[in-house]
Every structure is written in C-alpha cells, then in structure tokens.
C-alpha cells in the first residue's frame, strides 16, 4: 500500500488519522440496512472503517486505476463491497438502488472537483438520505455562510436551498498524506423536505446569474415589477438576499415565464 502515491492531478490527499476516520463514520451512523456509496476511496482507510460497521452494501467509486488492485485485494473478504471503476460523474446512482431505497453518500472529496460534486447532489435529492463529505474548509465555510458576508456566494444559496448543513469538524493538514496546503472540514448535508423548486437546473442558472457582479443591485438583473411582486427591494444586492428571498424571486419569475 505504501507504493501508492497520491496523484496531484486527481486532487488526492489520503486521510491517515484513525481518530478522524472513526468520527466521520460515527456521523454516518451505519445500520445493516444501509446502502452506502463512497466517492474516491483511495487506498481504503475510510472504506475499511465503514465495512467494519457492516452496512448492507458499500459501493466504492474510484477513478484511479492504480488503486483498484489494492482495494480489490484488501476487501476481497467482504461480500458487501463493490468497487466501481469509474469517474463519479459517469455513475448513475439510480441504478444502484431499488424503488424507495436511499443512499448515504460519503467521501473524502478531491479538492479540485468538490464543489461540482456537491452541486451534483442537488439533482439527486430523491435518492439521498444524506451526504457526509470531507472538503476544503474554505468550501465548507461557503456552504454555511450567511448573507452580507464575504463567504456568501452562489454555492451558499444553491446548496442551502436544498440541504440542511451541519459543520461537523475541522481537520488539520497533518492528518493527510500528502498534507494539503489548506485545512479541511467534514460536513453533513441532509436533504430538506418539501422544497418549492421544480426545475433545479433552471434555479441553478438563475442563482448563478444573480451572483455575477455580486455588488450590482438586483434591479440590473431582474425587472423591478417582478421584484415588487416578490416583496424584494430592487436596490438590494445578491449578497444581501436570504435563501428564502432567492426562492421567492425565482417563483415569481417562473410563474411569469409560463
């Protein structure tokens, strides 16, 4: 296993702290009925702890061909372990479950695509029980940011629309191989119920549009008549609006488009 070198191009930093691994798996709260999907298992440190807790099945999605033999050998004794040799974005999670089953999605996400992976989760709400991710602390702070703060961005609004977010803990660089140049964090994302957004892709584009030139007043992006219908001052900037404000404006715009 020591021969496996983390690949910079894949944004790999392997978690090596047993204590942190156990805390992450505690947060997953595994039962024997659970279907767990792990993104980027690497050499299997988190994978091993998950399997020790005996879920119904663990699918490990790994793009790096150099670790495939390591994972296959290490976990060959587990009948509930399935390795998917693929890019996460090419895997259809819906094919891994039966009707009404849900997935616990976990992983130490590659820093270079973590935000894209989290955004992708908003398009799979109906099959996710929750997500537990290790990500860059800077990204985690954006996920939980409030209006009128520097960390409040498109990502904050979009993800807070669809998920309740728990900041579990910070993880120093020394707990990884190689140590990243930044601090990491563990977050838990639980899908909200009864979300008033029917077209997630359109909503995503809408939020992204409003956050372009975030210091500009929103009346430069949305007709004042629409803003008045939504009960929003046209002189506000995107960074000053709450998640509820964005949802309300989008609802008015959607109705007008019909």
UniProtKB/Swiss-Prot annotation:
Reaction equation(s) it catalyzes: adenosine(1518)/adenosine(1519) in 16S rRNA + 4 S-adenosyl-L-methionine = N(6)-dimethyladenosine(1518)/N(6)-dimethyladenosine(1519) in 16S rRNA + 4 S-adenosyl-L-homocysteine + 4 H(+)
EC number from the UniProt entry: 2.1.1.182
InterPro entries xrefs: KsgA/Erm, rRNA_Ade_diMease-like_C, rRNA_Ade_Mease_Trfase_CS, rRNA_Ade_methylase_Trfase_N, rRNA_adenine_dimethylase, SAM-dependent_MTases_sf
Single annotated GO MF: 16S rRNA (adenine(1518)-N(6)/adenine(1519)-N(6))-dimethyltransferase activity
Positions bound to S-adenosyl-L-methionine: 13, 15, 40, 62, 87, 108
Record keywords: Cytoplasm, Methyltransferase, RNA-binding, rRNA processing, S-adenosyl-L-methionine, Transferase
Keyword Lipid biosynthesis: no
Cellular component annotations (GO), alphabetically ordered: cytosol
Places the protein is found: Cytoplasm
Keyword Transcription: no
Primary enzyme class: transferase
Physiological role: Specifically dimethylates two adjacent adenosines (A1518 and A1519) in the loop of a conserved hairpin near the 3'-end of 16S rRNA in the 30S particle. May play a critical role in biogenesis of 30S subunits.
Membership in a protein family: Belongs to the class I-like SAM-binding methyltransferase superfamily. rRNA adenine N(6)-methyltransferase family. RsmA subfamily.
Identification of the protein by name: Ribosomal RNA small subunit methyltransferase A
Name of the encoding gene: rsmA
